[in-house]
Curated annotation (Swiss-Prot):
Activity control: Allosterically activated by ADP and other diphosphonucleosides, and allosterically inhibited by phosphoenolpyruvate.
Binding locations of substrate: 125-127, 162, 169-171, 222, 243, 249-252
Binding site for ADP: 21-25, 154, 185-187, 213-215
Recorded superkingdom: Bacteria
Functional description taken from the UniProt entry: Catalyzes the phosphorylation of D-fructose 6-phosphate to fructose 1,6-bisphosphate by ATP, the first committing step of glycolysis.
Family note: Belongs to the phosphofructokinase type A (PFKA) family. ATP-dependent PFK group I subfamily. Prokaryotic clade 'B1' sub-subfamily.
Catalysed conversion reaction: beta-D-fructose 6-phosphate + ATP = beta-D-fructose 1,6-bisphosphate + ADP + H(+)
The protein, known as: ATP-dependent 6-phosphofructokinase
Major subcellular location class: cytoplasm
Pfam families per the UniProt record, alphabetical: PFK (PF00365)
Cofactor: Mg(2+)
Length: 320
């Protein structure tokens, strides 16, 4: 193996650049050439490749987003499109690929491996919804951004004795909502994986105001319903002023946290070593604080398990 490629796919996440940097520097240390593939699998098929050197990645560790750019490219599920991508890799002399992204990105990495190009996947998504890893690149940064935003929302909520329903990302996974909800002292956390009772939440808010509290915060994962709809449901059971706020894409931006930088660096370094050992079709994860690997195929049948005990902790916090 003399040359490897790296791409980012799907939604961007803080820490992707740190992973790209780690892959590049590790590969060069082991005598390999590195090419960045711009715009994900779309760029792979188009042959949009750029050489990466220590000099052009070294300062990227503190930057959010992905300087290789990203794109969603569902067409890569088609066999003939995959073959075009493999032909581009052969044309450029690239022997293996590291893919950073979420579930769809892993499908692409597995397809490349099946076509004879060893590929390793790194979990890059703020949702933290990948099976067999406790952590995905970007999750910690997204939580910090959401927490900072809710701290500011609380200031204005307290000034007007208002309730805010704050919508955070997480279509099928409530990890951001749970962690941020506990960290921001939310009155309620609502996620798609667990049942909830709007009436009980309204009663909790009402009791808080009666006890002298001057605001209410509900953290709502986007996969449950819109913040506006939840607010309207809430007001059927409570006599208070309520507003909806959607944090949306701001959660993907910003400089990555220490946790994201360190873990992305460790994962990127490890991924290169897996390729050097001739391994492919693997996903790198972090389990119990340690690097781990699983066959990508296993991820498709697996299920992410969040730290749902946080809901119980937060419920106790709201009773007093």
């Amino acid at each position: 193996m003399k040359r490897i490629g790296i791409l980012t796919s799907g939604g961007d996440a803080p820490g992707m650049n740190a992973a790209i940097r780690a892959v590049t520097k590790t590969a060069i240390h082991h005598g390999l050439e590195v090419f960045g593939i711009r715009y994900g699998f779309a760029g792979l098929v188009a042959g949009d490749f750029v050489p990466l050197t220590t000099e052009n990645v070294d300062h990227k560790i503190s930057e959010g987003g992905t300087f290789l750019y990203s794109a969603r490219f569902p067409e890569f599920a088609q066999e003939e499109v995959q073959q075009k991508g493999v032909e581009q890799l052969k044309k450029h002399g690239i022997d293996a690929v590291i893919v950073i992204g979420g579930d769809g990105s892993y499908h692409g990495a597995l397809a490349l491996t099946r076509h004879g190009v060893n590929s390793v996947g790194l979990p890059g998504t703020i949702d933290n919804d990948i099976p067999y890893t406790d952590y995905t690149i970007g999750f910690d940064s997204a939580c910090r951004t959401a927490m900072d935003a809710i701290d500011k929302i609380r200031d204005t909520a307290s000034s007007h004795h208002r309730v805010f329903v704050v919508n955070v990302m997480g279509r099928e996974c409530g990890d951001i909502a749970m962690r941020v909800g506990v960290a921001s002292g939310a009155d309620a956390i609502v996620i798609p994986e667990r049942p909830y009772d709007v009436k009980e939440i309204a009663e909790t808010i009402t009791r808080g105001f009666a006890d002298g509290k001057d605001h209410g915060i509900i953290v709502l994962a986007e996969g449950v319903m819109t913040a506006d709809k939840f607010k309207d449901e809430l007001l059927k059971y409570g006599d208070f002023d309520a507003r909806a706020n959607v944090l949306a894409h701001m959660q993907r931006g910003g400089s990555p946290t220490v946790t994201d930088r360190v873990n992305a660096t460790k994962m990127g370094n490890y991924a290169v070593k897996l390729l050097l050992d001739g391994k492919g079709g693997l996903a790198v994860g972090m389990e119990n604080g340690q690097l781990s690997t699983h066959d990508i195929l296993d991820l498709f049948d697996g299920k992410h398990h969040g730290d749902y005990a946080l809901l119980d902790v937060n419920e106790e916090m709201t009773k007093y």
